[in-house]
Amino acid sequence: SPETQEQQQAAPEPRVLVGEVVITGATGQLEDEIFRVISTRAGQATTRSQLQADVNAIFATGFFASVDVKPEDTPLGVRVTFLVQPNPVLRNVTINAVPEGLERRVLPQQVVDNIFSPQYGQILNLRQLQEGITKLNQWYKDNGYDLAQVVDASKVTPDGTVTLTVAEGVVEDIRVRFLNKEGQPTNEKGEPIRGRTRDFIITREVQLKAGDIFNRQTAERDLRRVFGLGIFNDVRLSFAPGTDPRRVVVVVDVIEKNTGSIAAGAGISSASGLFGSVSYQQQNLGGNNQTLGAEVQVGQRELLFDARFTDPWIAGDPYRTSYTVNFFRRRSISLIFDGGDNEVELENGDRPRILRLGGGVTFTRPLSRDVFTKAEWTASLGFQYQRVSIRDADGELAPQDEEGNDLSFSGTGKDDLLTLQFGAVRDLRNDPLRPSRGSLLRLGVEQSIPVGEGSILLTRLRASYSYYIPVRFTNFTKGKGVQALAFNIQGGTVLGDLPPYEAFALGGSSSVRGYDEGDVGAGRSYIQATAEYRFPIISVVGGALFVDFGTDLGSGSSVPGDPAGVRDKPGTGLGFGLGVRVQSPLGPIRVDYGFSDQGDSRLHFGIGERF
């Protein structure tokens, strides 16, 4: 009956008197350790459950490979014999990485020995061994190997060698998966989302390759590079099981952004009269991450255009070489022929316009064999052809100004300028947008080839060096950003022929602040220096105190026609002031108010830091 079953279940276990406790297989300290952990004692009663608990307690010490208990009846009571087999003395711990045949593993043997060497020469203790395994797994985590772990530790040889089997998280493949705006990999019909970007554009930015051990730190850098392409709203990683369960497929999930835009406008200006403009931008042309930009302006007086194509990484190139091709027809007011205390214009009272028609190509590559490591040096090489002409507001040629000075090198108002260009940049800044530590060196050489009108032979040399020092002059900005001192010195010279419009213009927002654009001077050579103290105000607003100095080194008169001299530009200028920087998606918006050594003051606007 149910009542009888409950009484049987509640009946206590039989208890027997222990006459003797014997340990077989262990002596000395191990025998003492067993007696320390067991509860069974001679002269006391015991039960089957207590004997099993003693077996478990002996196992829990970690010193034994097998433990059994054998009770026997004797005239004095039950003799309880614990039969044990001690572990061998630990001599060595080796690692077996799976899957088998893996050419390398990331766990150095030295790390293994450092963890387990305190146990060498002692009887293997499985509890201490497990503590060491926990440290091994933590080493993997600390070094970014999040998928790696010890999966088996059961192989122990009689001579004391323990073999740990580890699965380190081998990458079987890298795949790309496109997600919709909601982050789903399929559409309403259950079909996979098809992206515009070609897979290799993404995977070539990923350092992880099939056969590598997955590493979190490497994967994070890979994600930053893919996101840095500028064509995705979101980039993330997921995992899928490989065909071999001991391998993993790394999936790069991307959400594409709209990379194309078109705009149109119309207006009226004194330079172009009534005009209309159309512009087009595409950042991911053909799904190749290539950029195409074009702008056309049609006016009553001029047709202007500017088209540019950039491939940021030539397909198949192992060194991340890029190139840019551009064609243009641009018109601008020249700073060389404008400003100053003495206005010198054209005979008809117009200001000279510089019209440039031409195009060129530039190749750029980082000087590093490892495309996944930021290169200190970047080099560029290119050529450009321009037909340069000096014109008035109506687009008519204007070879001389009102004082009879030639405005072109040929004297006809037209010059042909074919140049080869070489540049090198060494970037050691900690942040390209808001640097507070490091330096930036720029070197440039431009060599013309005499062709066409003017047959110009010139060599232009330029250099610029910036240095950044983190400081803490005040404490009220603590936690809002980094304070820094920023210094820049630059200079240049032109050897050989010099068309006047190619002189170095000094003064303005990118030169000596406090002066209007180009109002300091125009020289064959120049030196310019700036010192700034940059500090945060709130999280998105910063401030700056600055001092600028620029000089043409007395070379203004060596420019054909002496355009700076006839306009009474001083040739040397000093400016100082203060400004604010407002962070925006376009970069820091720079607003500076400068005072010149001539007693003038001026407000300057710009995008990005001066240097």
Walk through the language-model features, giving the residues of each.
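Gram-negative/organellar outer-membrane beta-barrel architecture
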Residues: 92, 101-110, 126, 137, ...
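A generic structural motif
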Residues: 99, 449-451, 595
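Short Gly/Pro-enriched loop/turn and capping motifs at secondary-structure junctions
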Residues: 301, 538, 550-554, 587, ...
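C-terminal outer-membrane beta-barrel translocator/porin domains of Gram-negative envelope proteins
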Residues: 396-555, 560-562
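C-terminal beta-signal and terminal closure region of outer-membrane beta-barrel proteins
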Residues: 558-611
